[in-house]
Amino acid sequence: MSQLTSSVRVDVKTEYIETQSSPDEDKYLFSYTITIHNLGSDDVTLKRRHWCITDSNGRKSEVHGTGVVGETPTIKPNSSYKYTSGTVLETPLGVMEGSYTMVDSNGDEFKAPISAFRLSIPGLLH
């Protein structure tokens, strides 16, 4: 999954973490690895994140916060920043989507949207 906005491209890869999940207790742990590419000619800094997480029962949760994994990275032109985080769902299927608030070298804010991506245990969907 990939989203391109302005000079920023966001790629997402997900993984079900079976060893830390407990389906009998409705606990499904997923990791997601995000790569943010700066395709522009100026530095960009990730300031804030916003996630909307929905499980297959329609339960929604929102996450707002400063930076990602404790950092507010500045990404140089033609470079990327990669991190891994995770979320727990009560169902074996869900979706996440959101956005990053970025700041360019002029101090102007812009949103880098993150298209919806699926969180699913292996073999659930074809």
Swiss-Prot record:
Pfam families, per the entry: DUF525
Annotated Gene3D superfamilies: ApaG domain
All residue ranges annotated as the ApaG domain in the record: 2-126
InterPro entries for the chain: ApaG-like, ApaG_domain, ApaG_sf, Uncharacterised_ApaG
SUPFAM superfamilies in UniProt: ApaG-like
HAMAP family tied to this protein: ApaG
UniProt-recorded name of the protein: Protein ApaG
Organism: Shewanella halifaxensis (strain HAW-EB4)
Gene this chain is encoded by: apaG
